[in-house]
Structures are given as C-alpha cells and as structure tokens.
Amino acid sequence: MRIAIFTDSFLPGVGGTEKAVLGLATALAENNEVVVCAPYYSRKYKDDFQFQVLRANSIKITNNDYFAFPFTSCKFKKELKKFNPEIIHCQSVSPMAKYALSYAKKHNIPVVMTVHTKFKTAFERSIKSKVIVNALIKNLVKKLNKVKQVYTVSNDMIDELKSYGYCGEVKVIRNGATFSRINNLEEVKKLAIQKYNLANEENIFLYVGHIVKFKNLEFTINALKIIKDRGINFKMLFVGHGFDDDYFKNLCKKLGLEENVIFTGQITDKDLLSSLYGAGELFLFPSIFDNDPLTIVEAALHHVPAITIKNTGSSERITNNVSGFVVENDVQEFADKIIEAISDKAHLKQIGDEAEKTIPKDWSTTAQEYLNEYNNLITH
C-alpha cells in the first residue's frame, strides 16, 4: 500500500508528535511504501529513514516550529504526484492538512486524521482573543468533517473534540513505544549516574519533556517543596528545554530546591536519554494537557512507574497502585503519593516491573491497527 503521512511537526523538531510520526512511519514502511510530508527545516539535517520524506517550503516560527507552504512548493507537489498515494493520513491540522485535503479531493483518495493535541488550550496560550480562538476551533472542526475517519490517542480526547462541536465518530488508537525493551537496566543507567553524580542519591525523580508552564511543572515543584520540608532527600531531573526554563530555575531557587533539582537541558543523545530514564525511580507527570505522552511509555520500558493526575489522557494506560499511580489534581496528595511510593522500594520496583509489562505497545501493533483501517476505507 502507498501511504502518505502529512504532518506539520517532524524531525529535526523535538516533541511527542514528531516521535509518533517517526514511529508509525517506520513500522508502516516494513511492508508498505510510505512517504512523510513535512515542513522544510532551516537547520542542517539529513533525512535517513526506511521511508521517503518530502519537504514543503516553510518559514521559521520558533526553533521547533515551522509554517509550511505546500501549495507553493513545486518540487514537493511533483514528488507527491509521482508517489501517487492510495491513502493520506494527517497527523496535524494546520497547512499540511489543508493541502492533503485538497490533493485527496482532486485525486479521489481517502484521508484520515489523528488528533494529538488539545488545540483550544494550545490556542489560548498564545492568543488572547476568544473570537479568534473560537474561529480557529471552528476551522478545525470543518477539517475534521472533511476526512473519512478521525482518530485520537486517548479517550480524554474524544470528549475534547465533542466540546469543539465535532459530532462524528472518533476512534482511539494509542501510540507505540519508541525504545526497545531494556534487558540490561543496571548497565544502561551507569552513564547518567556518573554524568550527574547520582550514585549516592536515595531517591531519584524524573520528568522528560518541554520545560513550559502548561505541562503543570509548577505543580511538581511545589510538591517537591513539600517533600523537602518533610526532611526527605531526593534528586529531581528535569530533562528537556522550553520557553520557561528560567522561570522554573528561579522558582526552584526561591523555594530552596537548587541542591535537589537538575535541569539537564535538551538531550539528543539516545543512549544518555535512555540512561536517564533508567536512573529514575519515579516519573512525575502531572500534566492535564497531554493525551497519550510517549514519555510515560518510555519510562515504563525502563521499569520506572509514573504518577499522574486522575481523569487525564496521561493516566489512561495506568492501573492505579499496580502499574503506576493516579491521584487527584491536588499538590498535597501528589506529594503524599510520592512519599508513600518511595517508602517501600521493593513494592515500587514491583510496580515498575508491572509498568514495563503492561504499558508499552509496539509500533508494529499500532501500525497494523491503522493498516486495517486503511484497507477498510480503500475497499469501501
């Protein structure tokens, strides 16, 4: 099958959607012809994958975000026509999706779309006008109504899309795992332990992702303050970078957490990132914005359970007190659960082992679920 995946977020950008597109495209390419259609990034990067990548002209918005102009990209359009896709899968809803819908209509092929993001929350972060936000949501729903099938990665997102006014069917297909399963965990963690001087730390907590306010990191830091005030020693690793790096570093300084917290910055070395996961004992993820965060899956692959907030997409893979922890959206309860978890390291290890067994899902399984959907749409 010839499959074209359209996305506004791809490598060398950093984020969950980028990882999801890479994982899905790689798995689909095992037995299919796949092309990923994405914006051109100005920094040097070589596309070296099992699948083809077509880059559309774009302009830089941030270091991680580019606005694509596929309608004016002659080479891009020529190569896509040559590829001649049988189905198009949109992984975002911005300019690339608009072109995908236009191309599909002209060539009479089906389009499906996976929605990864709570767009209203994302829009409201940067746009103060409710009128403009509502207009953007209305435009999103208009696009959703033009595709053959809408997918998302969590049940929480089904309600989110309904709140936008979308009334069509939404199916949940969860993301796959990015790392392979870890067989030599003690060896894997040595690199991070040495680099960040963690050998004598009693309790090591971890977060991997963008360092931004909407990830609810202030919630985490306030919980850490409670834990420190109880006289508990720990080291917290914030792995990643973002617009609010300085804000959170200053907050940690203000709360007297400088000696307890390490901001590693962005980690692009896969071995070091894997080692950081392995060194952690508990993954702190109180985000109410994320839907099916791959970082929780990656932590689980390293036998590290997550603590999340109840009734969020982040918590859906977790069975409370079995494969991780789920608490109310309350800083005190979050802190209490962390303290409870680290008070019995043998039980915490059991929960981490169960997380490794039950939370990850292979990308090959996700790809097969989508292939079944593609075949059904093409033949009907």
Where do the model's predicted regions map?
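A short, well-ordered alpha-helix in the C-terminal region of glycosyltransferases
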Residues: E333, E340, H347-K361, T365
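Carbohydrate-associated surface elements
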Residues: Y40, D156, G176
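Short hydrophobic beta-strand element within catalytic cores of glycosyltransferases
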Residues: P305-T308
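Conserved acidic donor-binding segment of nucleotide-sugar-dependent glycosyltransferases
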Residues: N320-N321, F325-V331, E340-K345
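N-terminal subdomain of nucleotide-sugar transferases
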Residues: M1-K44, F49-R55, S364
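Nucleotide-activated donor-binding/catalytic signature segment of Leloir-type glycosyltransferases, i.e.
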Residues: K249-I267
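Aromatic "clamp/platform" in nucleotide-sugar-dependent glycosyltransferases that forms part
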Residues: I288
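Short alpha-helical donor nucleotide-sugar binding micro-motif in glycosyltransferases
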Residues: Q266, S274-G280
